[in-house]
UniProtKB/Swiss-Prot annotation:
The active site is at 368 (nucleophile). Keywords: Acyltransferase, Antibiotic resistance, Hydrolase, Transferase, Zymogen. Belongs to the gamma-glutamyltransferase family. This is Acylase ACY 1 proenzyme. Dimer of two non-identical chains processed from the same precursor. The keyword Calcium does not apply. The lineage of its organism: Bacteria, Pseudomonadati, Pseudomonadota. The gene is acyI.
């Protein structure tokens, strides 16, 4: 990355956290105990893939509202030899799912996925076929060095011993108490005596510890054909869900080639469809490359206006063109072509907000988690995983401690569209586990939770690093903006004068206390050290590893 230099800043802010620097490894997750789990595995001789999987399992315990083995996600891996691979373990629609399985309530922007009785949000009918456990185990088997049973030990211990509830977790429970109270298992676990767990209380998950031990003994087959899978399908059958044993048996992960774009001398690498991030971050960067964004100043009216217009263009194209490539022909080459960006950029008016439609023809919820890990050998993992909404579908499979996803919400409940439901179709996602390379050397890796706000927020972090020349800590904590074509959300640190100027240009501005979730990132410095950073929007914590073994031949003598 460029060394930080003074550039104009209209939106001023102060970082609330400090970065960490190490020489032998870095683990950054959205919970300190999950970061510690990954660091423990690195110190035990594991590589970045081993550590990332250990951190993800630990997050299923410490962040039960965000991620679970009944979820799904994407892992972007850079191997020590420079190869990149994306492991797609996104959830799929059950075999019994149909395009018209929900009753739609609206076609308005921001409300297109609203359904009668929230059936695609809460309850068994909202659950898609899980891919998380199979994906993590596959990553470990292909690219890790340690056995699954060893990698699971930190999470098992955390579930058995329990951990102290943070204010962040307590707030998430409080905000979703009504939905959690509908499920006996979740109510007993998170609402003891009918009240949300409070900060400082201890959360122990004995049933879930037993499930993790079963996985340690049997591998992913414990879910995809074994006892845990039967518990899930029995619950589905009894409660109106669609997942059956055939769905679990037929589930497959996909190994995908990443999308590669370029921006001001950097190669920007991200996941391909069914994720929208790689394609549309490349598209938006191509549009922004035609402007001197850095000279406009961070948080200025012009800079925010251009971000908003680029976002609206990307969302318009995304709605008709980007989905599961097994079901929809995605025009990737066209979308990331710089000539196409030139066409779209030429239509942007600096003094007026526009309503955008797609420039070509066609053929998620805010609660996720992210892990960024690097080892001393050059392996790097940027993994975004989720059960989709806070506490997923707010159902727990009895006797297992497993919390189910509500990934069906990511589909468009209207039939006949690119994102409509079809049996076996992979869910569409905005996950953005991104990496950037300059002159053949990895510069940074980052990601965050936040549903539709994920890839726009990742875009802004990339712009912060490259155009505004922020430090890594500043880039992840900087105030954000977001729009998909309706209202323009501004975090509170964006000045009111800028908000009013944007309103004058036709933007429908609303203030938001937070756009998307806690980003975490690693920068790879020219001297070989690593810098890790996490932001104020979650419990993110970087754990750096330095030092090492004694000098060869050294002995202790008196």
């Amino acid at each position: 990355m460029n060394a930080p230099v003074p550039v104009p800043r209209v939106a001023d802010f102060t970082c609330e956290k400090k970065p960490a620097t190490g020489s032998r490894g870095m683990v950054v997750t959205n919970h300190p105990l999950a970061s510690a789990a990954g660091a423990q595995i690195l110190l035990a001789g594991g590589n970045a893939i081993d550590a990332a999987v250990a951190s993800l399992f630990a997050l299923t315990v410490a962040e039960p509202m965000m991620v679970g083995i009944l979820g799904g996600g994407l892992s972007h891996i850079r191997l020590a030899d420079g190869r990149h691979v994306v492991i797609d373990n996104l959830s799929t629609a059950p075999g019994k799912a149909t395009a018209d399985m929900y009753e739609c309530l609206s076609d308005e922007i921001g409300k297109q996925r609203d359904t009668r009785d929230r059936e695609n949000v809460v309850g068994a009918k909202a659950v898609a076929v899980p891919g998380a456990l199979k994906g993590w185990c596959e990553a470990l088997a292909r690219f890790g060095t340690l056995p699954l049973a060893e990698v699971l030990q930190p999470a098992i211990g955390l579930a058995e011993r329990g951990f102290v509830v943070t204010p962040y977790l307590s707030n998430c429970i409080t905000d979703n108490a009504a939905d959690l109270a509908r499920d006996p298992g979740l109510a007993a676990m998170l609402l003891p005596g009918g009240q949300p767990l409070q900060p400082g209380m201890r959360l122990i998950q004995s049933d879930y510890a037993a499930s993790l031990k079963l996985i340690a003994a049997e591998g992913p087959e414990a879910l995809y054909g074994g006892k845990l899978g039967r518990a899930l399908t029995d619950y589905m059958a009894a409660n109106g869900g669609l997942i059956d044993q055939a769905d679990l048996s037929n589930y497959r992960i996909e190994l995908r080639e990443p999308i590669r774009g370029s921006y001001r001398g950097y190669e920007i690498i991200g996941p391909p469809p069914p994720s929208s991030s790689g394609v549309h971050i490349a598209q938006m960067l191509n549009i922004l490359e035609g402007y001197d964004i850095g000279a406009l100043g961070f948080g200025s009216t012009d800079a925010v206006h251009l971000l908003a217009e680029a976002l609206k263009i990307a969302f318009a194209d995304r709605a008709v063109a980007t989905a599961d490539p097994a079901f929809v022909k995605v025009p990737v080459a066209r979308l990331i072509d710089k000539a196409y960006a030139d066409e779209r950029r030429a239509l942007i008016a600096m003094e007026q907000a526009k309503s955008w439609t797609a420039g070509l023809s066609g053929g998620e919820s805010a609660d996720t988690t992210h892990v960024t890990v690097a080892d001393a050998m050059g392996n790097v993992v940027s993994a975004t995983q989720t059960i989709n909404g806070l506490f997923g579908a707010c159902v727990q499979t009895p006797g297992t401690g497993m919390i189910a996803n509500n990934y069906m919400y990511n589909f468009d409940p209207h039939p006949g569209r690119a994102l409509s439901i079809a049996p076996g179709k992979r869910v569409f996602t905005s996950m953005a586990p991104m990496m950037a390379v300059k002159e053949g050397r990895l510069a940074f890796a980052l990601g965050l939770p936040g549903a539709l706000r994920i890839f726009p927020s990742a875009l802004q972090a990339i712009v912060n690093l490259i155009d505004h020349r922020m430090s890594l800590q500043e880039a992840v904590e900087a105030p954000r903006v977001w729009t998909e074509g309706g209202v323009l959300e501004l975090e509170e640190a964006i000045p009111e004068s800028v908000a009013q100027a944007l309103i004058a240009r036709g933007h429908k501005v609303v203030r938001s206390p937070r756009v998307a979730g806690g980003m975490n990132a690693i920068a790879f410095n020219p001297d070989g050290t690593l810098t890790g950073a996490a932001c104020w929007r979650a419990d993110g914590t970087p754990v750096a590893i330095s030092g090492g073994l004694a000098r060869a031949g050294a002995r202790f003598t008196i």
